[in-house]
């Protein structure tokens, strides 16, 4: 857990931001509906984003948990939009209570205006507004370029999410990296000999079905299982439908597994084309902790679905208890080690404002929130899938 710099003291940070704002030729303000076109143009310019206005409104305005916090930076004289930050709300179960987190999905400053403190002021604006919303806090998965600057404004690294990969077509994967098709096929066949896994035993009492909408069965599953997850994004039919089925052009497929009419778990998957490969993504996997076989069967079903689609490899991103990690290992996934070429997925959170203004919440939840092994987070809880 990294903690250093001016951003970790509330009053020092406030003085810094106030002085900066008074001297600046720009200002930060809450978003207005007329800003949407400029926000999209800025994100396209900086990130190459292809998001449409419909997608932007779905993510920022239609979330059943609440509207996103959106701030913009503009030139004082011209009104030109030069920066933007947004965070979408997530209801977290934290122990026996509910806390609102605000996951930063966009943070962008025009290259011409970088180094002037705009990003810091936008971040603090989100922090202060988060606290006003039921004692909320900001969080996110900053990329490598933004990670250290995020820490300087008061965030701390809570944990690093684990990247799990399972290769389905070794010859195909190697062919994308090797010029020789013969060598790729031979090497891939040899690797497969050492990576055969045992098919999980099916059981007639388990029924796997594709889900077109989530309903009361997933609410019942969450109510039965929630106590086993100290910290997790609350999973309800309403939020899951918004996340996976109501997004424009939804690319997701979901499958449930049940016994005697009761859901024991679900899995959400999608397929993407990248680096000349067909990649399958385990976006979300949630199972009753007392029914490990349900998780095994869901992963095997996803495996078969991906194979039928010609997928080369499958990946997922989790911060999860050991029982989940074992489930993935048994299904043939391996955890990617720390490598220079692989981006680390550091999950950060900022508690400076809420700890200062709501010491009651800091006393109640602060220690638990900072315990890495108490969190359950999947790729679907982030903005990466």
Description of each model-found segment:
Residues 2-23, 89, 136-195, 243-246, ...:
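Active-site/acyl-donor-binding loops of N-acyltransferases
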Residues 78, 128-135:
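Secondary-structure boundary elements
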Residues 104-113, 133-138:
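Short acidic, glycine/Ser/Thr-rich loop/turn "cap" segments at secondary-structure junctions
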Residues 33-34, 112, 144, 319:
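Short, surface-exposed acidic/glycine-rich loop or hinge patches that mediate macromolecular interfaces
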Residues 109, 114-128, 292-304:
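Conserved acetyl-CoA-binding loop-helix of GNAT-fold acetyltransferases
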Residues 49, 66, 119, 131, ...:
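Active-site-proximal structural scaffolding
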Residues 23-108, 210-287:
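A conserved beta-strand-loop-helix scaffold within acyl/acetyltransferase catalytic domains
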Residues 177-221:
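Extended, charge-rich helix/loop segments that form flexible
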């Amino acid at each position: 857990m990294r903690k250093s710099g001016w951003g970790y003291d509330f009053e020092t940070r406030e003085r810094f931001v106030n002085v900066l704002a008074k001297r600046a030729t720009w200002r930060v303000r809450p978003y207005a509906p007329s800003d949407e076109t400029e926000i999209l143009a800025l994100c396209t310019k900086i990130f190459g984003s292809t998001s449409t206005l419909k997608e932007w409104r779905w993510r920022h305005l239609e979330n059943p948990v609440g509207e996103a916090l959106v701030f913009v930076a503009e030139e004082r004289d011209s009104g030109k939009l030069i920066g933007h930050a947004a965070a979408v709300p997530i209801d977290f179960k934290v122990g026996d209570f509910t806390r609102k987190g605000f996951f930063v999905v966009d943070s962008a400053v025009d290259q011409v205006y970088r180094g002037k403190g705009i990003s810091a002021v936008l971040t603090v604006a989100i922090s202060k507004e988060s606290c006003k919303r039921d004692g909320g806090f900001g969080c996110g998965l900053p990329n490598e370029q933004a990670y250290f600057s995020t820490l300087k404004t008061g965030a701390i690294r809570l944990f690093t999410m684990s990247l799990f990969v399972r290769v389905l077509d070794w010859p195909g994967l190697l062919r994308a990296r090797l010029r020789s098709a013969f060598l790729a096929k031979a090497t891939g066949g040899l690797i497969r000999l050492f990576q055969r896994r045992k098919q999980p035993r099916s059981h007639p009492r388990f029924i796997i079905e594709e889900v077109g909408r989530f309903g009361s069965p997933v609410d019942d599953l969450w109510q039965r299982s929630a106590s086993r997850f100290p910290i997790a994004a609350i999973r309800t039919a309403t939020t899951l439908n918004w996340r996976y089925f109501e997004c424009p052009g939804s690319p997701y497929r979901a499958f449930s597994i049940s016994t005697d009419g009761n859901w024991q778990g679900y899995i959400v998957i999608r397929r993407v084309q990248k680096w000349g490969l067909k990649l399958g993504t385990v976006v979300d996997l949630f199972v009753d902790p007392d029914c490990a076989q349900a998780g095994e069967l869901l992963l095997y079903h996803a495996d078969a679905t991906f194979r039928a689609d010609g997928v080369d490899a499958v990946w997922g991103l989790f911060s999860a208890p050991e029982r989940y990690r074992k489930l993935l290992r048994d299904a043939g996934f391996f955890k990617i080690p720390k490598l220079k070429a692989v981006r680390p997925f550091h999950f950060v959170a900022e508690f400076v404002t809420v700890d200062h203004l709501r010491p009651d919440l800091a006393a109640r939840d602060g220690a638990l929130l900072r315990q890495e092994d108490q969190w359950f987070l999947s790729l679907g809880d982030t903005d990466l899938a």
